[in-house]
Amino acid sequence: LVGSEMCIRDRHYIFPCEMSSLDELSGLPNIVYLDRGESYEDDRLRVNVFGSTDMGVSYLVTAEGKTIFHAGDLNNWHWRDESTEEEVREAETAYLSELYYMKRTIKSIDVAMFPVDARLGKDYMRGAEQFVGEFNVGMFVPMHFYPAVRKAEAFAPIAKRYGTEFVLLSRTGDSVII
């Protein structure tokens, strides 16, 4: 979490409403708490908040004509190898419902940061593929994959099939120009 010593006074911090009761954040300047369906806008950017299928929320940031989506824990989280068929269906339904909700607002995304988590077992890329299949995504950056770098790399041909550039940031300090 962001501690007061890390809080830069001329910046705004946007957190999910569920974090508003944390003692570590109380009294810090420039904090905005948002929930699914809410947004924040200033003279430089707009942040739309969407849901998650686990903890927190997901964010769509629009700035300088670019849209950047950070999925947080939004994903088709199911462990088919361990879950019942009903649990798999529930996870799939929750995830696809959130994508449907998002499609009412989002037409295209320049950069999407999205989980490709090999801990899910054989379906670990399913949510990511459903995501790039639903939205016109220019660049896909996987997250939640370390240390399974090769598993994350396996998504590159899927992204390409949807006309999406795949960028793997696998080491500390890696960056990409948008």
Language-model-detected regions and their locations in the chain:
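Core dinuclear metal-dependent hydrolase active-site scaffold
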Residues: 30-108, 171-178
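A general structural signal for stabilizing positions within well-ordered secondary structure
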Residues: 5, 102-103, 131-134
